[in-house]
């Protein structure tokens, strides 16, 4: 059943779909997070994964930056390891460390023993989506998931990693095990995204946080087929889909290929790549999202104002050069030390330009 809302005036959905928005849309990755005192107050009482599986908490945390900053989109408060936890994989999110896996995946037998994700296991997430779509009014809700490669890296390494040694060793040296793992994680990612779509999200974003550690050759051989299946399957949902990674300048063309042809497609760009270069690298018909350096928000208003104006100008130039649209965002997530007042002022400035 299609529970999606009609939001014809949304500048975010317009830009993501290749239409002309009435203003430059803006939202921020990690806009619901530690930069907000109201978030810190809630999180002082609840562990991260506990919060991610509490529908009312997810709703409240997701709404906080929408109320405060008047951004043009909400993104569901969650974590990329939530579907792994929901499926029954032992893990925890350790403060100041990140996701830590109880029993890392190292063999084909480990892969074959992995549980699948069933929709009842993410019922709290779906309920949070329903609560949010009832409360958000004309603001669209973005659902999201981690991409198979990034999930695989956490599972194989056992936690965050600088060099992803075990992940790449499996990928390059045990390709049958690797592709079996990626197939299982692609199925899991699709199931998690589908549960969000069925509950009513208005758009999707897939985060491949660690894809930038790969060469283009390895990305095409070992990752692209699986990411492409995620987007090809989800294209039937009829919602805009964004593909984002960090340090992925050389991969932007391939990442745009992963997005299903004919769907509303957006490629996220980090601050290391100009929007002009990104527009030249992605396939025709893709919009761009980005790409302010998150650290700029720590540098004081005169610096922020200049940088925000530049990104808006660069976005307009990219659209003139052929990009389907531009959505203002950061090139990564909001840093915890960011003054929320600066974010509010940046949103107001983007809307005024």
UniProtKB/Swiss-Prot annotation:
Cited Gene3D superfamilies: 3.20.20.210
Molecular function per GO: uroporphyrinogen decarboxylase activity
Localization terms from the record: Cytoplasm
Entry's EC annotation: 4.1.1.37
Entries under InterPro entries matching the protein: UROD/MetE-like_sf, Uroporphyrinogen_deCO2ase_HemE, Uroporphyrinogen_deCOase
Enzyme class: lyase
Residues with site note (Transition state stabilizer): 79
Pathway: Porphyrin-containing compound metabolism; protoporphyrin-IX biosynthesis; coproporphyrinogen-III from 5-aminolevulinate: step 4/4
GO biological process: protoporphyrinogen IX biosynthetic process
Subunit structure: Homodimer.
Function of the molecule: Catalyzes the decarboxylation of four acetate groups of uroporphyrinogen-III to yield coproporphyrinogen-III.
Similarity annotation: Belongs to the uroporphyrinogen decarboxylase family.
Protein name per UniProt: Uroporphyrinogen decarboxylase
Phylogenetic lineage: Bacteria, Bacillati, Actinomycetota, Actinomycetes, Mycobacteriales
Encoding gene (name): hemE
């Amino acid at each position: 059943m299609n529970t999606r809302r009609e939001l014809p005036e949304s500048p975010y959905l317009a830009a993501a779909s290749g239409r002309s928005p009435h203003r430059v849309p803006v939202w921020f990755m990690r806009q619901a997070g530690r930069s907000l005192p109201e978030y810190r107050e809630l999180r002082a009482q609840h562990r991260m994964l506990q919060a991610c599986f509490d529908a009312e908490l997810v709703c409240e945390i997701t709404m906080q930056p929408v109320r405060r900053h008047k951004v043009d989109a909400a993104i569901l408060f969650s974590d990329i390891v939530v579907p792994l936890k929901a499926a029954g994989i032992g893990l925890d999110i350790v403060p100041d460390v990140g996701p830590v896996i109880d029993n890392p995946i190292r063999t084909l037998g480990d892969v074959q023993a992995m549980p699948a994700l069933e929709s009842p296991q993410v019922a709290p997430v779906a309920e949070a989506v329903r609560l949010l779509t009832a409360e958000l009014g004309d603001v669209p809700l973005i659902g999201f998931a981690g991409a198979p490669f990034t999930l695989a890296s956490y599972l194989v390494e056992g936690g965050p990693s600088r060099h992803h040694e075990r992940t790449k060793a499996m990928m390059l040296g045990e390709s049958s095990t690797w592709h079996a793992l990626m197939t299982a994680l692609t199925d899991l990612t699709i199931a998690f995204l589908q549960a969000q779509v069925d509950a009513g999200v208005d758009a999707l974003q897939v985060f491949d946080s660690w894809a930038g550690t790969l060469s283009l050759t390895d990305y095409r051989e070992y990752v692209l087929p699986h990411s492409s299946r995620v987007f090809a399957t989800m294209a039937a949902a009829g919602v805009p889909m964004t593909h984002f990674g960090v340090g992925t300048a050389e991969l932007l063309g391939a990442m745009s290929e992963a997005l299903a042809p004919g769907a509303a497609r957006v490629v996220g760009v980090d601050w290391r790549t100009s929007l002009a270069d990104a527009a030249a690298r992605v396939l025709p018909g893709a919009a761009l999202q980005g790409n302010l350096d998150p650290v700029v928000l720590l540098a004081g208003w005169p610096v922020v104002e200049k940088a925000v104006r530049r990104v808006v100008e660069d976005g307009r130039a990219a659209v003139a050069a052929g990009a389907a649209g531009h959505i203002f965002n950061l090139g990564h997530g909001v840093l915890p030390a960011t003054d929320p007042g600066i974010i509010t002022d940046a949103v107001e400035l983007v809307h005024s330009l």
